Swiss-Prot record:
GO terms for biological process: regulation of translational fidelity; translation. Heterotrimer of A, B and C subunits. Keywords: ATP-binding, Ligase, Nucleotide-binding, Protein biosynthesis. This is Aspartyl/glutamyl-tRNA(Asn/Gln) amidotransferase subunit C. Its EC number is 6.3.5.-. Allows the formation of correctly charged Asn-tRNA(Asn) or Gln-tRNA(Gln) through the transamidation of misacylated Asp-tRNA(Asn) or Glu-tRNA(Gln) in organisms which lack either or both of asparaginyl-tRNA or glutaminyl-tRNA synthetases. The reaction takes place in the presence of glutamine and ATP through an activated phospho-Asp-tRNA(Asn) or phospho-Glu-tRNA(Gln). GO terms for molecular function: asparaginyl-tRNA synthase (glutamine-hydrolyzing) activity; ATP binding; glutaminyl-tRNA synthase (glutamine-hydrolyzing) activity. The gene is gatC. It is an enzyme of class 6 (ligase). It catalyses: L-glutamyl-tRNA(Gln) + L-glutamine + ATP + H2O = L-glutaminyl-tRNA(Gln) + L-glutamate + ADP + phosphate + H(+); L-aspartyl-tRNA(Asn) + L-glutamine + ATP + H2O = L-asparaginyl-tRNA(Asn) + L-glutamate + ADP + phosphate + 2 H(+). It comes from Desulforapulum autotrophicum (strain ATCC 43914 / DSM 3382 / VKM B-1955 / HRM2).
Length: 95
């Protein structure tokens, strides 16, 4: 499956990743290779292969709640794309 440079740039923008021109070409090739391999995996015959076991198949698996100290606003807001003092700034979505 082919992916365009514009697709990679759009994905980087959505993920808020800074990608320069030299990286776009490399990422475009890498993502295309990954998507091509996914197409190959779709064709694999898995009839007769038992389902995986373990945590992935667990239903209603709960753990006990444990109170842990908060890391504080400096840590939690460190990667926020936009902030105002100790608050996240998000786009307005209501009229």
């Amino acid at each position: 499956m082919k992916i365009s440079k514009q697709d990679v740039e759009h994905l980087a923008h959505l993920a808020r990743l800074a990608v320069d021109g030299s990286q776009v070409e490399s990422l475009t090739a890498q993502v295309s290779n990954i998507l091509d391999y996914m197409d190959v995996l779709k064709e694999v015959d898995v009839d007769g292969v038992p389902l995986a076991s373990g945590a992935a198949l667990g239903t209603n698996v709960f753990r006990q709640d444990q109170v842990k100290p908060s890391p504080g606003p400096c840590v939690t807001l460190a990667n926020a794309p936009e902030r105002d003092d100790d608050f996240y700034t998000v786009p307005r979505i209501v009229g």
